[in-house]
């Protein structure tokens, strides 16, 4: 799972700088994409627009209010965007991730489309000109504190080749293909290794992997326990692509689906596993972790188990109700803790 959640209006510097420059783009047909501030879902400051999103949780929120004004991209559908006159793109902290998605969008729009990119300095906004120097001419048109707004003219449209963004590595005879923004993009992380190491006994039944990312947790379990039935979920389109393709690459069968934690989970499972995200960009956010724990009982069979790995700096008192939850620490090191919660 990518470490991304929707921003609130109170912390959206990007929205404030766009509102300040509203006259620049208010009357043009507009594509709004990237990490979109939640205020854009509530206030229509642009009359004719379409949201182009890569995160399922954001898609679900937009769908409730603007069902005709949203496209959810999962790399399998080519959408006609050439009629739009401008693109407003909200930057992520990951340079390779925004290069992936902005390149994809540029390959589908008109050459006359005007590009606006907005983001904070810590997200790499000031390096945007260098990253797209072969295709776009950028000019900074406004800035406020640590947030900047750039306008770009298209010199030529890039061709999008997904394979150019794929990183491949091998761990314990498991081949992993990953895309920018997917957790575990460069290599398997230490937390996932620790969680996998706790599965030293035979596992049976149905397994749910929340925030599957590359799919490494489920793949490692299925390699050791070939009779288990695995379901992998995520909110990020690139993560779903990775999970699906890595199952195939490692000769495994499983279900892979979009779900905002438990939003599209209807069955009960013998085991739920997760290495949940605890950050939004550079800030700690434990909402997802809390929801996974709190609602796990509804999706576990009798005597079922939730097994998750969390950073050791997180206080268990903050995320677990000791009076209502039966849990124990299975393994711990300086950086991570593996927790088992039984139903």
Curated annotation (Swiss-Prot):
Belongs to the methyltransferase superfamily. RsmC family. It catalyses: guanosine(1207) in 16S rRNA + S-adenosyl-L-methionine = N(2)-methylguanosine(1207) in 16S rRNA + S-adenosyl-L-homocysteine + H(+). Keywords: Cytoplasm, Methyltransferase, rRNA processing, S-adenosyl-L-methionine, Transferase. Pfam families: MTS, MTS_N. It comes from Buchnera aphidicola subsp. Cinara cedri (strain Cc). GO terms for molecular function: 16S rRNA (guanine(1207)-N(2))-methyltransferase activity. It is found in: Cytoplasm. This is Ribosomal RNA small subunit methyltransferase C.
